[in-house]
Design a protein with these regions (language model features):
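Short beta-strand-to-loop acidic/aromatic patch adjacent to the donor-nucleotide binding site
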Residues: 95-103
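Acidic donor-diphosphate engagement hotspot in glycosyltransferases and nucleotidyltransferases
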Residues: 26, 54, 85, 109-111, ...
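N-proximal low-complexity "stem/linker" segments adjacent to membrane-targeting elements
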Residues: 1-32, 38-39
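Hydrophobic helical membrane-anchoring modules
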Residues: 1-9, 158-160, 184-243
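Donor nucleotide-sugar binding loop of glycosyltransferases
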Residues: 19-22, 50, 81, 107
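Acceptor/aglycone-binding surface of glycosyltransferases and processive sugar-polymer synthases
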Residues: 75-91, 96, 108-188, 214-233
């Protein structure tokens, strides 16, 4: 029988790069989320050397919302999403860590869905899948979907997991487990690397839940491209076979 998990603080890591148009909006969405069981929110924003007004937008938001627990870290040079996550993971003090993009593609209201398997005592890690469940999904790029499913299937073959969405942003981790991993990938290779390494932890309990997805186009600011897909392919082999 599963034992209920006690959680005091959820660390929310937000890597940002040139998200001046949306960063204040995602922070407002997070602010409105009421977590169960009096869990506190620790928001960690890592600016990856933005060249727009992202930093000033963050600072302005913090001044008018000083009751929120927000920590900000700055990279002097652009290193990539993975590097920003490494910085955020090192700063996190909560028992659990969730990853949140600043682009409004993922809805913070669904933290409750991801948290439930943990709070019920069943899970150490929870992935939010865009390909399961009955929630809303914006209809976009066919080949992105094909590529995502291919990478997920290939990753599953090596990890012996049955994930439906390895590349999802929404990943919730036991902080001690995540911090124990020697993560190296500084860009979008973070997803296959962390999946490969977390799957190797003895007796780790990984769950998946369905989430909504409000994808954006490249004109709207989407950053991932075909080169990142090839890097993900390399990382699946590197961290599962070459090690």
């Amino acid at each position: 029988m599963a034992t209920k998990q006690k959680m005091n603080t959820l660390s929310i890591i937000i890597p940002v790069y040139n998200e001046g148009n949306t960063v204040h909006l995602i922070l407002e969405k997070i602010k409105k989320v009421v977590l169960p069981e009096n869990i506190e929110k620790e928001i960690i924003i890592v600016d990856d050397a933005s060249t727009d007004d992202t930093v000033s937008c963050i600072q302005a938001y913090c001044k008018t919302n000083d009751t929120l627990k927000i920590r900000i870290a700055y990279h002097k040079k652009n290193k990539g999403k993975g590097a920003a996550l490494h910085t955020g993971i090192a700063l996190a003090t909560g028992e659990y860590i969730i990853i949140q993009d600043a682009d409004l593609e993922y809805d913070p209201k669904e933290y409750l869905i991801l948290l439930q398997p943990v709070l019920d005592g069943f899970a150490d890690v929870v992935y939010g899948s865009r390909f399961m469940g009955g929630n809303a999904h914006r209809v976009l790029f066919f080949w992105h979907t094909v590529g995502n499913k291919f990478l997920t299937t290939l990753s599953n073959m090596f990890t012996n997991l049955n994930l439906t969405d390895m590349e999802t942003c929404y990943k919730l981790f036991d902080a001690k487990m995540l911090k124990s991993l020697n993560l190296k990938e500084e860009r979008f290779g973070f997803e296959p690397e962390v999946t490969a390494k977390i799957s190797k932890i003895p007796k780790v309990r990984i769950y998946e839940v369905g989430i909504s997805y409000y994808g954006r186009t490249y004109q709207e600011g989407k950053k991932i491209n075909w080169k990142d897909g090839f890097r993900a392919l390399f990382c699946i082999v590197r961290y599962n076979v070459l090690r």
